[in-house]
UniProtKB/Swiss-Prot annotation:
Designated name of the protein: Lipoprotein signal peptidase
Top-level enzyme category: hydrolase
Similarity annotation: Belongs to the peptidase A8 family.
GO CC annotations on file: plasma membrane
Lineage, uppermost ranks: Bacteria, Pseudomonadati, Pseudomonadota, Alphaproteobacteria, Rickettsiales
Membrane-spanning parts: 25-45, 54-74, 83-103, 116-136, 141-161
Active site: D137, D150
Membrane topology reported for the UniProt record: Multi-pass membrane protein
Pathway where it operates: Protein modification; lipoprotein biosynthesis (signal peptide cleavage)
Single GO MF annotation: aspartic-type endopeptidase activity
Length: 168
């Protein structure tokens, strides 16, 4: 009941041309998320590169691992790294630019913030590909290994599903 009310309110907050302050705060928050993701990745790259084969177990199914992903989600195309990095760098950039266009059309704050999360996550993974030639994944939950940028993309996508299921 409370969750439905919160979702209803979030789906109906307007993003008008006069609400540049809301957009500015969302942008500042997004840039902070991007910086956090890059700093955390840099920390774990430097911390774990001495022993990349050893994962740090925190809980039974939660570890910090050292994994370079040359492909896409879940390691698909991971073994074609000689051609995949440039290909996925171009594809990721095109997708982020398309979502940058969509964010300009956002009418509600939830929609705007969802697009912002996806843009920030995609941009962080693009930065990884440009700097390292692959995306660094370190959060290891049982069978899935990902990074904070992937989490931003996932949460942004879930928010869009919520938005479109309630609003459209």
């Amino acid at each position: 009941m409370l969750l439905e009310q919160v979702i209803y309110i979030m789906c109906n907050l307007e993003v008008s041309k006069n609400s540049s302050r809301n957009k500015l705060w969302s942008l500042i928050f997004g840039i902070q998320l991007l910086i956090i993701d890059q700093l955390v990745k840099s920390f774990f790259i430097n911390f774990l590169k001495k022993t990349p084969e050893i994962a740090i177990s925190i809980f039974k199914y939660f570890k910090i691992s050292y994994v370079w992903n040359y492909g896409i989600s879940f390691g698909i195309f991971n073994y074609y790294y000689d051609i995949s990095n440039n290909f996925f760098l171009i594809v990721n950039t095109i997708i982020v630019l398309c979502i940058c266009y969509l964010i300009t059309k956002a009418k509600k704050l939830l929609q705007f913030n969802a697009y912002m999360l996806i843009i920030i996550g995609g941009t962080s993974n693009i930065i990884d590909r440009m700097l390292y030639g692959a995306v660094f994944d370190f959060i290891d939950i049982y069978l899935i290994i990902f990074n904070l940028a992937d989490l931003y993309i996932f949460v942004g996508t879930i928010l869009l599903v919520i938005y479109y299921s309630y609003y459209e």
